[in-house]
């Protein structure tokens, strides 16, 4: 794919600067979700096993170029030591004499964590001088933070031009999964796009209709498309001012040979709350006081049938109000169908986005998907067809 991995590098005795995403939630000094740290473990273990000395570069929160104690990475040292099962040292800067001294003194089997890169205001400006200061700490640069790859920052883009560079295991897995999904996918390809607003996913929809065979639209977005087709949506969440744009997307999809799938029947309630009284109606029968909160059983059957004839699935966004029972039914059932097909070796399934990950976890389907991205903005920008600076830098370095 044009970029190098850890397998292409001689790591013996080398100081390996690893750009990581350890932007984890902390409450009262306690890490409440260590998923991002756990996902780094293969990279750190492989570097240590090959005789390399990992030096971690990371941002934490948005300090705006100021040193803020509550955003210091030093508080993560105990959590990292437990995860990596080795000694983790800490330097109170990511450049300068103290950081250079700590990097030079790092012993085999140890890990060095550098202070928050965003304590330097120039980090987010892709400052080459800051990148040069970081590069002095290592012999090799390894980017394992796909979640930050859509940002051209000193620690993600500029530094890759200054050292031999490669992708870490997490970055490698993410890029390989995404290449399978949209780069050179097995066809037919289906995309599921849900969520509240068409306006926030215009570029995404525009890119997908050129690349996929079926585009399943759910959530509040689907209501806007129903409005564009002249169908009633009552008091449902819908962007009525976007109906002309939605109509244009429908026309472009038809011209591109992409079949857009909208709900043929809907689950309607008068209140947006769990277990609200509801009814299943055809998509042309939503009453004035009704709110569409989920796709109906006929719609779900159609989605399952499309999954069965697909070879690749990309999923971003729920099909309904998944946070409210029973309006999570279509999302859960579709997710479990995709999981079963993946388990049977009949489907490559890739999903990403905050609500998507939450919905798939809630359904119990997440563990069977081929790949689930926790990268958020980077995953969306990749789906939109944009060039990610952090990835482009690795390709150029390769």
UniProtKB/Swiss-Prot annotation:
Any GO BP annotation: glycolytic process
Molecular function (Gene Ontology), one example: ATP binding
UniProt pathway: Carbohydrate degradation; glycolysis; pyruvate from D-glyceraldehyde 3-phosphate: step 2/5
Reaction equation(s) it catalyzes: (2R)-3-phosphoglycerate + ATP = (2R)-3-phospho-glyceroyl phosphate + ADP
EC nos: 2.7.2.3
Residues at which substrate binds: 21-23, 36, 59-62, 118, 151
Main location: cytoplasm
Binding positions (ATP): 201, 323, 353-356
EC top class, as a word: transferase
InterPro entries: Phosphoglycerate_kinase, Phosphoglycerate_kinase_CS, Phosphoglycerate_kinase_N, Phosphoglycerate_kinase_sf
Any one Gene Ontology cellular component term annotated for this protein: cytosol
UniProt xrefs under Pfam families: PGK
Keywords: ATP-binding, Cytoplasm, Glycolysis, Kinase, Nucleotide-binding, Transferase
Compartments in which it is found: Cytoplasm
Alphabetical list of PROSITE patterns matching this protein: PGLYCERATE_KINASE
Assembly with partners or alone: Monomer.
PANTHER family to which the protein is assigned, alphabetical: PHOSPHOGLYCERATE KINASE (PTHR11406), PHOSPHOGLYCERATE KINASE 1, CHLOROPLASTIC-RELATED (PTHR11406:SF23)
Family, as annotated: Belongs to the phosphoglycerate kinase family.
Name of this protein: Phosphoglycerate kinase
Organism: Ruegeria pomeroyi (strain ATCC 700808 / DSM 15171 / DSS-3)
């Amino acid at each position: 794919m044009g970029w190098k991995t850890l397998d292409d590098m001689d790591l013996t005795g080398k100081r390996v600067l690893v750009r990581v995403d350890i932007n984890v939630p902390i409450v009262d000094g306690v890490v409440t979700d260590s998923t991002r740290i756990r996902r780094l473990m293969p990279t750190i273990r492989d570097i240590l096993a090959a005789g390399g000395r990992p030096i971690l570069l990371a941002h934490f929160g948005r300090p705006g170029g100021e040193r803020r104690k509550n955003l210091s990475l030093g508080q993560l040292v105990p959590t990292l030591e437990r995860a990596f099962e080795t000694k983790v040292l800490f330097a109170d800067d990511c450049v300068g004499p103290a950081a250079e001294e700590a990097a030079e003194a790092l012993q085999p089997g140890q890990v060095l964590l550098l202070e928050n890169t965003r304590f330097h205001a120039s980090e987010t400006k892709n400052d080459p001088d800051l990148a040069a200061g970081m590069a002095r700490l290592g012999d090799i640069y390894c980017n394992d933070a796909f979640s930050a790859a859509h940002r051209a920052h000193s620690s993600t883009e500029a530094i890759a031009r200054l050292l031999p560079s490669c992708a870490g295991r997490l970055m490698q897995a993410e890029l390989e999964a995404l290449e399978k999904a949209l780069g050179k996918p097995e066809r037919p390809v289906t995309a599921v796009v849900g969520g509240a607003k068409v306006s926030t996913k215009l570029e995404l929809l525009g890119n997908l209709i050129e690349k996929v065979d079926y585009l399943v639209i759910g959530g509040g977005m689907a209501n806007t498309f129903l409005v564009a087709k002249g169908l009633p949506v009552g008091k449902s969440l819908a962007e009525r001012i976007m109906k002309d744009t939605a109509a244009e997307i429908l026309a472009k999809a038809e011209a591109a040979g992409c079949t857009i799938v909208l709900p043929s029947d809907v689950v309607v309630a008068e209140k947006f709350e769990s277990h609200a009284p509801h009814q299943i109606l055809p998509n042309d029968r939503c009453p004035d006081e009704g709110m569409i909160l989920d796709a109906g059983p006929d719609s779900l059957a159609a989605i399952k049938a499309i999954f069965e004839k697909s070879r690749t699935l990309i999923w971003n966004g729920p099909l309904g109000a998944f946070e409210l029972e029973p309006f999570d039914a279509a999302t859960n059932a579709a997710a479990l169908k995709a999981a079963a097909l993946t388990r049977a070796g009949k489907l490559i399934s890739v999903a990403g986005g905050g609500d998507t990950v939450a919905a798939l976890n809630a359904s119990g389907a997440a563990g069977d998907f081929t790949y689930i991205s926790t990268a958020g903005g980077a995953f969306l920008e990749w789906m939109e067809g944009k060039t990610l600076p952090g990835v482009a830098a690795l390709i150029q370095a390769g």
